[in-house]
UniProtKB/Swiss-Prot annotation:
Its main location: cytoplasm. This is Acetylglutamate kinase. InterPro entries: AceGlu_kinase-like_sf, AcgluKinase_fam, ArgB, Asp/Glu/Uridylate_kinase. It comes from Colwellia psychrerythraea (strain 34H / ATCC BAA-681). SUPFAM superfamilies: Carbamate kinase-like. Keywords: Amino-acid biosynthesis, Arginine biosynthesis, ATP-binding, Cytoplasm, Kinase, Nucleotide-binding, Transferase. It is an enzyme of class 2 (transferase). The gene is argB.
Length: 260
């Protein structure tokens, strides 16, 4: 796995792509054409979670773009992400002959979690643990589809921010990472898309309120990954799945988050 030519590609999806069947199909079609590339999909699904919580009479609270997960909502959120969303993606992928396998972060002891100290309730901080399951699946040419549900050492389920989950899987496999979002990248104060962004620039834009909400969490996760892996991380739009092949060909796509 450490041969750069053979580095797997971790793609994080979420947001509106999960509500737009044609967009998911287009992404999976591009993945199906990457014949010699090992790919792992990591997904969130906040839109589906919000809908299911509302149907159950719960409200949704977020802090700094991160979901607050009260203990009484964990079962419902886990069912939405590891169940409904995960199996829908797997079903679509398998209909396209992609041999998808649905997983959560704690399957095969891949990722261990500790409870977040940010007063977010049952939210986990992911840490790499054991790559054996993913190694076996990728070697056998399966497409792992991983939900952002993990578990603490005592077995309690926790919700993990999907960007953080993707970063952890990326670190576990020493992989390339592409964070797909609803927009073409990160914007500057003038509303123009940035081709690259480092920690100092990001902090300034966050303080100015230019980077806000869910994009704050995404940029912070990408910066963390860039620092840990010592290479740039791409934040790009799911609306242009052809960018994946451009990225693999060495071209810059979206906003490249740079290590210091």
């Amino acid at each position: 796995m450490n041969n750069p030519v053979l580095k797997p590609l971790v793609i994080k999806i979420g947001g509106a792509i999960l509500e737009k069947e044609s967009a998911l199909n287009a992404l999976l079609n591009v993945i199906s054409q990457l014949k010699n590339k090992q790919v792992v999909l990591v997904h969130g699904g906040g839109c589906v979670v919000d809908e299911m919580l509302a149907q159950a009479g719960f409200t949704t609270e977020k802090k700094h773009g991160l979901r607050v997960t009260p203990k009484e909502q964990v079962g419902l959120i886990s069912g939405a992400l590891a169940g409904t969303v995960n199996k829908a993606i797997v079903g679509t992928a398998n209909s396209m002959d992609l041999a998808a396998v649905g997983l959560s972060l704690n399957d095969g002891d891949m990722i261990s979690c500790t409870l977040s100290t940010q007063d977010l309730g049952q939210v986990g901080v992911p840490q790499t643990n054991n790559s054996k399951l993913l190694d076996c699946l990728l070697k056998a040419k399966f497409l792992p589809v991983i939900s952002s549900i993990g578990a603490l050492d005592n077995g309690d389920l926790v919700n993990v921010n999907a960007d953080d989950a993707a970063v952890a899987i990326c670190q576990l496999l020493n992989a390339e990472l592409l964070l797909l979002t609803d927009v073409n990248g990160v914007k500057d104060a003038d509303g123009e898309y940035l081709s690259s962004l480092n920690a100092e620039q990001a902090q300034k834009l966050i303080e100015q309120g230019v980077i806000a909400g869910g994009m704050t969490a995404k940029v912070n996760a990408a910066l963390h990954a860039a620092q840990q892996l010592r290479r740039s991380i791409a934040v790009a739009s799911w609306q242009s799945p052809e960018q994946i092949t451009q990225l693999l060909d060495g071209h810059g796509v979206g906003t490249q988050i740079q290590p210091n």
